[in-house]
Curated annotation (Swiss-Prot):
It holds the Pfam family IPPT. Coiled coil: none annotated. Belongs to the IPP transferase family. The lineage of its organism: Bacteria, Bacillati, Bacillota, Clostridia, Eubacteriales. It comes from Clostridium novyi (strain NT). This is tRNA dimethylallyltransferase.
Amino acid sequence: MKQDLFILAGPTAVGKTDISIKLAQKLNGEIISADSMQIYKHMDIGSAKITEAEKEGIPHHLIDFVSPFDEFSVAEFKEKSKNAIKDIASRGKLPMIVGGTGFYIDSLIFNYDFANTYKDEEYREHLKNLASEHGKEYVHELLKDIDEVSYKKLYPNDLKRVIRALEVFKLTGKTISEFNKEQDIFDIPYNVYYFVLNMDRSKLYERINKRVDIMMEKGLIEEVKSLQNMGCTPDMQSMKGIGYKEILYYLDGKLSLDEAVELIKKGSRHYAKRQLTWFRKDNRVNWIDKDQYKDDTEVCNAIEEKFLNLKNNL
């Protein structure tokens, strides 16, 4: 029998945290975070990490456990999440994936396993060198003639995935989407119940701007200063997150404070747009428009009802 897996996703600042706590209480669940910034220690304000008080006693997994000096891969997330899902289920609880990092979520609900197959390290290095010499756009353009779907879907900055698409074509003669279809990507050990929160874009952008102002008031500059004093630099994976890189540039005198704050807001709004685009590509998603409900309690009731109906109709 397949394990039930509940997913609550949505763009940054849409209000996932509060709703996830209410749902975990209703559904007897524990939360596995799918957030690529909340994994890091010492990075609480800029990642909007949930506090102990906000957890209201609900156990959380995969939060605050990676050093900002370390890299953390999607493969590692998948492995740790699978272990957490087993652990939660063994105690009779519902595993709940909550977050906005789409490729973390996809690693669990698609049957992607490239870790030990179809690799060509030499070709990867060659493409990385091309990107260093000629720019990421140059490597992205290589996709145009061989895999137009990936060319249109992937941004030049998403170099890892661009290289992966080129690598799969070189090794198999197939586009990555064709290759994935043949791998039976929906053959996973879970019954997936996937909900994505959304709201009117102007309201969401207002919430994002307000959230950034609150982060500044809470001491984001001091948090980044502390990380800088620890030895963190802009080239580290952890420091490339929105909010951290801009404040680092401010501290280094490359931006004024107003410029840094405006860039954080702008970057967060663009990120929210990309997140929504990502979630829209999965037809298993049940969209929840928060504007249709009076408050979070009503939102939770609607999600709970939909979840139970889906379970009963399996």
